[in-house]
């Protein structure tokens, strides 16, 4: 019989369909894994935001990964509380976002945000802080489009939620 740690190891293979370098564990959408005495596995996930179109794909991919590794009974449940926050993204996940060319989110408790000031978003390509937001809407709803004024590269920023 599989253990919770075995399941977590398998879930590391399930990637966010919109950002394929980060796993559902690194993104921290997996909230809980329960392995029943009958072998049934229940994985509880929380959407990054209400209506996130990737959640159905993630749920399907989670089931597929576990079934392919011999787990016959899998259920994926979604919970909305507590609400997901970018603060939960792991340090490895943030590093992978940056290496992929997406500026990782700052902490939501950033004092500049609390004061209503514009965020300072370092360029994931060259590290410059001389950047400007081009659009609050990037390639997906959870990202904004920025440009570096030094290396002139456009890049996505994972919005703080």
Regions found by a protein language model. Give the residues of each.
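N-proximal, solvent-exposed amphipathic alpha-helical segments enriched in charged/polar residues
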Residues: 1-27
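Residue-level signature of catalytic and energy-coupling elements of molecular machines
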Residues: 11, 30, 52, 74
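Short edge beta-strands and adjacent turn/loop segments
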Residues: 21-46
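Short, non-transmembrane amphipathic alpha-helical segments
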Residues: 49-73
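AMP-binding/adenylate-forming catalytic domain of the ANL superfamily
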Residues: 76-82
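Short, low-order "capping/linker" segments at domain edges
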Residues: 85-100
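Cys/His-clustered metal-coordination modules, chiefly Zn-binding fingers
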Residues: 97-161
């Amino acid at each position: 019989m599989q253990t919770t740690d075995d399941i977590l190891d398998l879930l590391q293979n399930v990637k966010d369909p919109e950002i394929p370098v980060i796993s559902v564990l690194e993104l921290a959408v997996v909230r809980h894994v329960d392995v029943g005495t009958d072998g049934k596995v229940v994985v509880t996930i929380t959407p990054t935001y209400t209506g996130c179109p990737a959640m159905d794909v993630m749920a399907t991919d989670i089931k597929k990964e576990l079934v392919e590794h011999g787990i016959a009974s899998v259920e994926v449940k979604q919970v909305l509380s507590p609400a997901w926050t970018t603060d939960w993204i792991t340090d490895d996940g943030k590093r992978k976002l940056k290496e992929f060319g997406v500026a990782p989110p700052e902490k939501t408790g950033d004092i500049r945000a609390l004061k209503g000031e514009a965020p300072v978003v370092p360029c994931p390509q060259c590290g410059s802080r001389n950047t400007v937001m081009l659009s609050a809407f990037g390639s997906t709803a959870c990202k904004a489009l920025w440009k570096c004024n030094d290396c002139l590269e456009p890049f996505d920023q994972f919005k703080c939620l």
